[in-house]
C-alpha cells in the first residue's frame, strides 16, 4: 500500500527539521514484526513531511524523500498536520488509499480526485517558479506504478505549465523522488560547477521573487551553492533564531510585490554574509611534530532557536598555508564540526591557518590567520651507506646526512651482522662522522650493514640493508659435475665446492651445456649458489656435455672438465600396420611392415609378428615370427581362411604397443585349363578380335579374371589382356604377321594353366613410317636428299613422295617415284628449309616421316641498294670542315647467312675500307669538287657486288670575316657597319653575319645574327668602351671570328627644359624663371637664355650662367617678346660644352595697366595675346595634322580606284 502526501501550497511548518535531510527511522519501523504493513509516504520536492516519534518528539522531513511507516492494523498512521491544513484520505476503485494534505480553503477542497492530484493545481505564484517544479512541459507526470493498487494514470491530467525562467535548472520528477542533494554534496561541487550555479542564481534572483519571504522549504541558490530550507531555518514560531527574517505567509503572491520582495531577500542574504564574515580565528592546541588540533567558535548572531534542535547548523572550511601569512592556502577540511585534527605535517615547520563559515549556502569571508610551528622530532630514516673502498680485510663506508627535522644530528649508529647471515645486527660504529672503516675482516666475505641517525630528540629508523663484500681470490677450477640420475628429458647433476674456499664464502656456480655436436660453444643453463641442478627440456637418448665454472666478487674461475652424459631412451611407438606383400595363395602369403615413426631414441632390437584365425575364441594371439626383419612369409595355412595379423617391436627403451590388425583370407584352388582362343570375324592388318570359353572347374569357384598372352614373331611373349570379359581386341599389330595367342583363368585360388596356342595371321596393310631422310649440301649450292625403304607391311612399296618447303605450312610435293634419292637446286643461301617423306603400296599410304630441317650454306652479301650523301647533317656534328668532307649513308644489304665484316668505298682513283657501319665521313676532299662513289659489302665468304655509282659534290670554303667599323656613336648607342652592302657577290652567296659583344666576364655573347651590314647597339652606358667581333657564315659553313674591335659611346647632352615662366616686375623689367637640371656624371650644367623681339627672325642670347633665373630691364610696352632657354653641359675632362635642345618659347607683352603672364603656349587671357603668333609646338602639331589629313585622303582615293 502507498500513501502519497500531496501538498497544494507551501506549509510554513514551525517544527525542527532533521539534520542534513536524513530520514529518522522510528524504532517500531525497524523492529516491527512481519505481519505489519509498510506504508510508503512520498514527499515531493519542495515539501516538508512531519511525523511524531515514539518519544513524542516531532521530526521534519524535507522532500524529495520516501518515508516508510509501519501500520500494525493496516490503517493510516497518525500524521501531524499544521494549523490551517487538513489531511484527506481518498480511496480509489482499486482500494488504494492515499492521503492528501490541503489547506482549509473552499477552492482547495477539490470536488474531483484528479483536480486534487494535479501538480500545479491551486499553487501560489512562488511555487510555480520554484526550481523543483518542471515548467513548460507537455508530459503528464504520474506516481510510480508498482502494483495493482496504484492510482490509474487518468487521474493525473496533463497540464501545460507556464514558461520557466530558469535557464539551466535540473529537471527533477514530482513523484518517486528518493535521492536529493544533501548539504555535503552541495559543498563538494567543483569550482566550475559553482561558478555556473552562481550565474544561474543571478538570473533567478533578477527574474523571480525570492521564495524565502514565504517561509517555504524551497531550495535557494546563492554564492554557487544550492540548499533546501528546513522548516526552522526560515524562522521558527518563537522568532528567536538569527536566521532569515520571518514574514507573514500570504495565500497568494502579487506581481507588484516582486521588486520589494527581491530587495528584502538580498538584504537578508547580505546580513547573513556579514555575520558569517565575523568568525574568530581558530585556536591551535596539542601541537606535535606531525599533527595539531584546530578548534573554532561559530559566528555570533546566527544561533538557532529553541525549536530547531540544532546547535551549529553551519559548515566550515579550513585553509592551510606553509608559504607564509600571504602565501597560497589549500582547503584541508570541509564539514560541520568545530574541531579538526591536522595530520601528516612536516616537523619544525611554520604554518598559517584560517577558517571560513557557511550557512544555508552563503559563505563568509575568511577569519584572521593564526600561525603555529610544529615540534621537532627524530631525524628521517637515512639512505643506506655506500661502499667507498674495500680490501681483503677492510671495508670503508660513507653516508649522507638525512633530514634532521629541526634538531641537529649528533651521532650515527652503524650496525652489521659480522658476516653471519640471519644472525642479528650488532653495533660497529657510533659517532658524528659520516664514514667508517672496518678492519680485520675475512677475504671474500659479505657483510650486511644498516644505518640510523640520532639527534637530541631521538633516533631515526634504520635504513635499508646493504651487503658489501671484501676482496678475495678468484675461485680455483672446480671439479667436473657428477651425474646423479638421467631421465628421458632431464638429467640431475651435482658438484662440490672448489678447493681453497671457506665455508662462509659465497660462490656462484654457472653450469654450461653443449647441445649440438657441430657447435663447440657452451651455453649457460644454470646460475646460482646451489650444489645441484636438474636440467630439463632435453632431447631423449641424446648425448650432452656439461662443464662448471665458479665465480665470486673477484672474478670467474676456469671451466671444469667436461662431463658427457646421455639421456635415457623412450619406449618406441608401434610399427605400421602389416601389409600383404605379393599375391595371397591358398596355403600362404607374405606380409611386411615398416619400423615405427618414433623409435624412442634407440635402435629397434626385434619385431614380434602375431597371428590369429577367425575361428579362435577370445582372439588368442600367437607369435608367428620374432626377429629383426620387417617381412615374413606364411606357409601351410588353410585355404579360404580369414587370419588377423599385428606387429610390435622391442628396444632398450621398452616394449611398444601393438599395431592395428590386418585381416587376410587365403585363396581357394585355381581354375582348370581354358580352350584355345579363336578369331571373331576376319583379322585386320593392325588388330584381331579374340574370344574364348569359360574353363571347367572342379572346385566350383567363379573365375574373376582372364589373362591373354601373345607371342610375337621374335618369340617375345607379353600379356595383351587382363579382365573378366570372355573376348578382347588386340591392337597395334603388324600387317601380314603371324601371332600366337593363349589364355588362362584366375580366381581366389590363383591362375589356372594356359590353354593351347592359336596361330593367327594379320592382313596386309599400308607401309610403315619412313625414317627421317638424310640431307647433304653440294659445293655448287644444291641439296641432295636420300632415304631408306620402310617396312612394307606385307605388300611391296609402289611409290615415294617427297615434300619440300620453308616451313611446315608451305610444304609442296617436289618428287614422287621409286628412287631413294633426289637432288634439289635453285635454293636461297643461308635459308631454312624442311622436308618429309611418305611411302605407298597397294594397301594404301603410310604415315609421314618426321619433319627434317635443313639450312643452306651462306654466300657473299648482296649489293648495297641505297647509297646517299647526307646534305642536312649539322655542321657541328663533325669537327672537319664541310668543304673537305662528305657524309655517306647507306642501308645494310642482306648478308646471306654470314655477318658483314666491312665495306669498300670506291672513289674512282682510291678505295677506302670501313668497318661494319652504315655511315662514314669522307675526309681530306677538295672543296667544291664532284666525286663518283660506289660501295660493296664483305663477309667471311667474300665480297659482294658493287652498288651503282652516285655523284656528290663538296661544299665551297666558308667566307672570311668583314672589317667592323663604327658608323655613328651616341651616348647610349653605337651604330656599327661592316662589309660592302652593294656587292653582288655577297648578295649571291646569301651570307649571314654574327655580331658578338664582350661582357664584363670577358665572354662574348651574340647580339645580332642576320644578313644586314649594319646594326645599332642600344641601352649602352655613356662615355664607355665596348669590344666587338664579327663572323660570316654561308652555305659552306661558318667562317672564323674577326679580331676584336673597340668603340666608345659619347657623352649625353642635357635634356630639354620646359618653357620658362616670365613675371613682370616694377618698371620696364621682367624676371624669367626656368627649371634646373642636376649635374650629369659630375659635370656642371650652365644655362643659355635667348630672346626674340617683335618681328625679328633670329633669337639673341641675353644670358649664360649657372643660375636658373634672370631679370631683363628696359623693355618696351606693347611689344612681343619670346624667351627660350637651353641647358649646356660643361665636360670637365675634355673642356667641351654639350648644349641641349632649346625649350619651347614663352611669350610676354609688357603693358602699363595689367600684365598677363604665361608659361604655356598661347595661354594668356588678353584678346591681343590670343592673336599672337603660335609657338613652335603649335606649328609642329599643325604640320603633323595636315600630313595625316592628306594621307587619309590619298588612301581613300587609292582605294576608290583599286575597287573600281
UniProtKB/Swiss-Prot annotation:
Where is composition skewed (Polar residues) in this entry?
Answer: 205-215
Q: Where is the Fibronectin type-III domain?
A: 278-377, 381-473, 477-570, 574-669, 673-765, 766-859, 871-957, 958-1052, 1056-1153
The transmembrane residues are 1182-1202
- Tissues showing expression: Predominantly expressed in white adipose tissue (WAT) especially in the stromal vascular cells. Expressed in adipocyte differentiable 3T3-L1 cells but not in the non-adipogenic cell line NIH-3T3. Expression increased in the early stage of adipogenesis.
Query: Where in or outside the cell is it found?
Result: Membrane
Membrane topology qualifier: Single-pass membrane protein
The principal localisation class reads membrane
GO molecular function terms listed in the Swiss-Prot or TrEMBL record: RNA binding
- Indicate where the modification Phosphoserine is found in the sequence: 208, 393, 1163
**A Pfam family reported for this protein in Swiss-Prot or TrEMBL:** fn3
Skewed-composition ranges (Gly residues): 228-242
Mind telling me which Gene3D superfamilies this protein's record contains?
Answer: Immunoglobulins
Known function = May be a positive regulator of adipogenesis.
Q: Which family does it belong to?
A: Belongs to the FNDC3 family.
Q: What's the name of the protein?
A: Fibronectin type III domain-containing protein 3B
Organism name? Homo sapiens (Human)
Q: What is the lineage of its organism?
A: Eukaryota, Metazoa, Chordata, Craniata, Vertebrata
Amino acid at each position: 500500500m502507498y500513501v502519497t502526501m500531496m501538498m497544494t501550497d507551501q506549509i510554513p511548518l514551525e517544527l525542527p527539521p532533521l539534520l542534513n535531510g536524513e530520514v529518522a527511522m522510528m524504532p517500531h519501523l525497524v523492529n516491527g514484526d512481519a505481519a505489519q504493513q509498510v506504508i510508503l509516504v512520498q514527499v515531493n520536492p519542495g515539501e516538508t513531511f512531519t511525523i511524531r516519534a515514539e518519544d513524542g518528539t516531532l521530526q521534519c522531513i524535507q522532500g524529495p524523500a520516501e518515508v516508510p511507516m509501519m501500520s500494525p492494523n493496516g490503517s493510516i498512521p497518525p500524521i501531524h498536520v499544521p494549523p490551517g491544513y487538513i489531511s484527506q484520505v481518498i480511496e480509489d476503485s482499486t482500494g488504494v488509499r492515499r492521503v492528501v494534505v490541503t489547506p482549509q480553503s473552499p477552492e482547495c477542497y477539490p470536488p474531483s480526485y484528479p483536480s486534487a492530484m494535479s501538480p500545479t493545481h491551486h499553487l501560489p505564484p512562488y511555487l510555480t517558479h520554484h526550481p523543483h517544479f518542471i515548467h513548460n512541459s507537455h508530459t503528464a507526470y504520474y506516481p510510480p506504478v508498482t502494483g495493482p493498487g496504484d492510482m490509474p494514470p487518468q487521474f493525473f491530467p496533463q497540464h501545460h505549465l507556464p514558461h520557466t525562467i530558469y535557464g539551466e535548472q535540473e529537471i527533477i520528477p514530482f513523484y518517486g523522488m528518493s535521492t536529493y542533494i544533501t548539504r555535503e554534496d552541495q559543498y563538494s561541487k567543483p569550482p566550475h560547477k559553482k561558478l555556473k550555479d552562481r550565474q544561474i542564481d543571478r538570473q533567478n534572483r533578477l527574474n523571480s521573487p525570492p521564495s524565502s519571504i514565504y517561509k517555504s522549504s524551497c531550495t535557494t541558490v546563492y554564492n554557487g551553492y544550492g540548499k533546501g530550507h528546513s522548516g526552522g531555518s526560515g524562522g521558527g514560531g518563537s522568532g528567536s533564531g538569527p536566521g532569515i527574517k520571518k514574514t507573514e505567509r500570504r495565500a497568494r503572491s502579487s506581481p507588484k510585490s516582486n521588486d520589494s520582495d527581491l530587495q528584502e531577500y538580498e538584504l537578508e542574504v547580505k546580513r547573513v554574509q556579514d555575520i558569517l564574515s565575523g568568525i574568530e580565528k581558530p585556536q591551535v592546541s596539542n601541537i606535535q611534530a606531525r599533527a595539531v588540533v584546530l578548534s573554532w567558535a561559530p559566528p555570533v548572531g546566527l544561533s538557532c532557536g529553541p525549536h530547531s534542535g540544532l546547535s551549529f547548523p553551519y559548515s566550515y572550511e579550513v585553509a592551510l598555508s606553509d608559504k607564509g601569512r600571504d602565501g597560497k592556502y589549500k582547503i584541508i577540511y570541509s564539514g560541520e564540526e568545530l574541531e579538526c585534527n591536522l595530520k601528516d605535517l612536516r616537523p619544525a615547520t611554520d604554518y598559517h591557518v584560517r577558517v571560513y563559515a557557511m550557512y544555508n549556502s552563503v559563505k563568509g569571508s575568511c577569519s584572521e590567520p593564526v600561525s603555529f610551528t610544529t615540534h621537532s622530532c627524530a631525524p628521517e630514516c637515512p639512505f643506506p651507506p655506500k661502499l667507498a673502498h674495500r680490501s681483503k680485510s677492510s671495508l670503508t663506508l660513507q653516508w649522507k646526512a638525512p633530514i634532521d627535522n629541526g634538531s641537529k644530528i649528533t651521532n650515527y649508529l652503524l650496525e652489521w651482522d659480522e658476516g653471519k647471515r640471519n644472525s642479528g645486527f650488532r653495533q660497529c660504529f657510533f659517532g658524528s662522522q659520516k664514514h667508517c672503516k672496518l678492519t680485520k675482516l675475512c677475504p671474500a666475505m659479505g657483510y650486511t650493514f644498516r644505518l640510523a641517525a640520532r639527534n637530541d630528540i631521538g633516533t631515526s629508523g634504520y635504513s635499508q640493508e646493504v651487503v658489501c663484500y671484501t676482496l678475495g681470490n678468484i675461485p680455483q677450477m672446480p671439479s667436473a659435475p657428477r651425474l646423479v640420475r638421467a631421465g628421458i628429458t632431464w638429467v640431475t647433476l651435482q658438484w662440490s665446492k672448489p678447493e681453497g674456499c671457506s665455508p662462509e664464502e659465497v660462490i656462484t656456480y654457472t653450469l654450461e651445456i653443449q647441445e649440438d655436436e657441430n657447435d663447440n660453444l657452451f651455453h649457460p643453463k644454470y646460475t646460482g649458489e646451489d650444489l645441484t641442478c636438474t636440467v630439463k627440456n632435453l632431447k631423449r637418448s641424446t648425448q650432452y656435455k656439461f662443464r662448471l665454472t665458479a665465480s665470486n666478487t673477484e672474478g670467474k674461475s676456469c671451466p671444469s672438465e667436461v662431463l658427457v652424459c646421455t639421456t635415457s631412451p623412450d619406449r618406441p611407438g608401434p610399427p605400421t600396420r602389416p601389409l600383404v606383400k605379393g599375391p595371397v595363395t591358398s596355403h600362404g602369403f607374405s606380409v611386411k611392415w615398416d619400423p615405427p615413426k618414433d623409435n624412442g631414441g634407440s635402435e629397434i632390437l626385434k619385431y614380434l609378428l602375431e597371428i590369429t584365425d577367425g575361428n579362435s575364441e577370445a582372439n588368442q594371439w600367437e607369435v608367428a615370427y620374432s626377429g629383426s626383419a620387417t617381412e615374413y612369409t606364411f606357409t601351410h595355412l588353410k585355404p579360404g581362411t580369414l587370419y588377423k595379423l599385428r606387429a610390435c617391436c622391442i628396444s632398450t627403451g621398452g616394449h611398444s604397443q601393438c599395431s592395428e590388425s590386418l585381416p587376410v583370407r587365403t585363396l581357394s584352388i585355381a581354375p582348370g585349363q581354358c580352350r584355345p582362343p579363336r578369331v571373331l570375324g576376319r583379322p585386320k592388318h593392325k588388330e584381331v578380335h579374340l574370344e574364348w570359353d569359360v574353363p571347367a572347374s572342379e572346385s566350383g569357384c567363379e573365375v574373376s579374371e582372364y589373362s591373354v598372352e601373345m607371342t610375337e614373331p621374335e618369340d617375345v611373349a607379353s600379356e595383351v589382356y587382363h579382365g573378366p570379359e570372355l573376348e578382347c581386341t588386340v591392337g597395334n599389330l603388324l600387317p601380314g604377321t603371324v601371332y600366337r595367342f593363349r589364355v588362362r583363368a584366375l580366381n581366389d585360388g590363383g591362375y589356372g594353366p594356359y590353354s593351347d596356342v592359336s596361330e593367327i595371321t594379320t592382313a596386309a596393310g599400308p607401309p610403315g613410317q619412313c625414317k627421317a631422310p638424310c640431307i647433304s649440301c653440294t659445293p655448287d649450292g644444291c641439296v641432295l636428299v636420300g632415304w631408306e625403304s620402310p617396312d612394307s607391311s606385307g605388300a611391296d612399296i609402289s611409290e615415294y613422295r617427297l615434300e619440300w618447303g620453308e616451313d611446315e605450312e608451305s610444304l609442296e610435293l617436289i618428287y614422287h617415284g621409286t628412287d631413294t634419292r633426289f637432288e634439289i637446286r635453285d635454293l636461297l643461301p643461308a635459308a631454312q628449309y624442311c622436308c618429309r617423306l611418305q611411302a605407298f603400296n597397294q594397301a594404301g599410304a603410310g604415315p609421314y616421316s618426321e619433319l627434317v630441317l635443313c639450312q643452306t650454306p651462306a654466300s657473299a652479301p648482296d649489293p648495297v641498294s641505297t647509297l646517299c650523301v647526307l646534305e642536312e647533317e649539322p655542321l657541328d656534328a663533325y669537327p672537319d670542315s664541310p668543304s673537305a668532307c662528305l657524309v655517306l649513308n647507306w642501308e645494310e644489304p642482306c648478308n646471306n647467312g654470314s655477318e658483314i665484316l666491312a665495306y669498300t668505298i670506291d672513289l674512282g682513283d682510291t678505295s677506302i675500307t670501313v668497318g661494319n657501319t652504315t655511315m662514314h665521313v669522307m675526309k681530306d676532299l677538295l672543296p667544291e669538287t664532284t666525286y663518283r662513289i660506289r660501295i660493296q659489302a664483305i663477309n667471311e665468304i667474300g665480297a659482294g657486288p658493287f652498288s651503282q655509282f652516285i655523284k656528290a659534290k663538296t661544299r665551297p670554303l666558308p667566307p672570311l670575316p668583314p672589317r667592323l667599323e663604327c658608323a655613328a656613336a651616341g651616348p647610349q648607342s653605337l651604330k656599327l657597319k661592316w662589309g660592302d652592302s652593294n656587292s653582288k657577290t655577297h648578295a649571291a652567296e646569301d651570307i649571314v653575319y654574327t655580331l658578338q659583344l664582350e661582357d664584363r666576364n670577358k665572354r662574348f655573347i651574340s647580339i645580332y645574327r642576320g644578313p644586314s651590314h649594319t646594326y645599332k647597339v642600344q641601352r649602352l652606358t655613356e662615355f664607355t668602351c665596348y669590344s666587338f667581333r664579327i663572323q660570316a657564315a654561308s652555305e659552306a659553313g661558318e667562317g672564323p671570328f674577326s679580331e676584336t674591335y673597340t668603340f666608345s659611346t659619347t657623352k649625353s647632352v642635357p635634356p630639354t627644359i620646359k618653357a620658362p615662366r616670365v613675371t613682370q616686375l616694377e618698371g620696364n623689367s621682367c624676371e624669367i624663371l626656368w627649371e634646373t637640371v642636376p649635374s650629369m656624371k659630375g659635370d656642371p650644367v650652365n644655362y643659355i637664355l635667348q630672346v626674340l623681339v617683335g618681328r625679328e627672325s633670329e633669337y639673341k642670347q641675353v644670358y649664360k650662367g649657372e643660375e636658373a633665373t634672370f631679370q631683363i630691364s628696359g623693355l618696351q610696352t606693347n611689344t612681343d617678346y619670346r624667351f627660350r632657354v637651353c641647358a649646356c653641359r660643361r665636360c670637365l675632362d675634355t673642356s667641351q660644352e654639350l648644349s641641349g635642345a632649346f625649350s619651347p618659347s614663352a611669350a610676354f607683352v609688357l603693358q602699363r595697366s595689367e600684365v598677363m603672364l604665361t608659361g604655356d603656349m598661347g595661354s594668356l587671357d588678353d584678346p591681343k595675346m590670343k592673336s599672337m603668333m603660335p609657338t613652335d609646338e603649335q606649328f609642329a602639331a599643325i604640320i603633323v595634322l595636315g600630313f595625316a589629313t592628306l594621307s587619309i585622303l590619298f588612301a581613300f582615293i587609292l582605294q576608290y580606284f583599286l575597287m573600281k
